[in-house]
């Protein structure tokens, strides 16, 4: 059996038995960057108005309960998780519990003692997001000096220590012109990089408008930005029309996220459907969360849509863009249409073209 097939089998068995195969711990809302499109970053005063960060002991307790459920993968994120003073202690504890730990980071602080920690207790993976191809772009997007210089230096140091970072570029209107430069840098250093342009409007405590930063991935522009990337032309998944709205989400039923203030959600982009692991315990909270998620209805517009097999119809995206889980947003509909056209060898001539035969 191939590894991909084996992984699908494990995920299916976990979903059938309601076992969380993996979890995300959002350790903090704080960050050393101040990215203008971030959905979570808070100042200390803002965070105090929203709640309290979980203590070291609370995170250890949650991790112990998570371990007892059979969870294997543990993703650590923030904010910037490594800004917590107790990060080294928590990280080492999670590793020693037997979790396959992944770290998401902006990469700026992954040097010195933190690099040594990661080298001694190697994670399953380190995901580093790039925000520009120059120090100037980093300052514009993240408000940080020497960002590109420091981050790329740390990425190469991770690689030299035996940790191969997985890179992502978050594309906005402020850094899209750096895309080719970043791709070239990654290629020259034999590093894989994925492109992400689907900015989600912040709906958590870091509420702000980011419409001016979003890239309109329509028509030919989609092809220019993604070229022949497989993500554009493949089906998202095959599914029946009667399936619930989380049918396309690989995390549903097999994963959860604990937010910095102690709520259990499906992911950190879906804040309003949650349970309380601190009072219920992790297992009971996971059961309650999935019951609540199952009650969410699919938008009526999706039922007979011609593009449904090519649509990453995410309820969290619906909520952030329309304020309602049951209302679709045009940006996702357009992306699904483009995938459909590309897969069926239709030529898109203009950014605003509508094919009436397919809509």
Regions found by a protein language model. Give the residues of each.
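Flexible mid-to-C-terminal extensions adjoining Fe-S/redox cofactors in radical SAM and related proteins
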Residues: 1-14, 19, 263, 268-359
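Conserved alpha-helical substructure of the radical SAM core
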Residues: 1-125
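Cysteine-centered iron-sulfur cluster-binding motifs in ferredoxin-type domains/subunits
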Residues: 26-34, 253, 302-309
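Short loop/turn motifs at secondary-structure junctions
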Residues: 34, 70-71, 122, 163-164, ...
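Short glycine-enriched, charge-decorated loop/helix-capping segments at active-site entrances
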Residues: 44-53, 140-146, 320-321
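Residue-level signal for the nucleotide or nucleotide-sugar donor/cofactor binding architecture
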Residues: 54, 85, 146, 174-177, ...
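Conserved short loop/turn motifs at secondary-structure junctions
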Residues: 80, 170-172, 322
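Radical SAM enzyme [4Fe-4S]-AdoMet core and its adjacent flexible, acidic
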Residues: 100, 119-120, 124-125, 129-265, ...
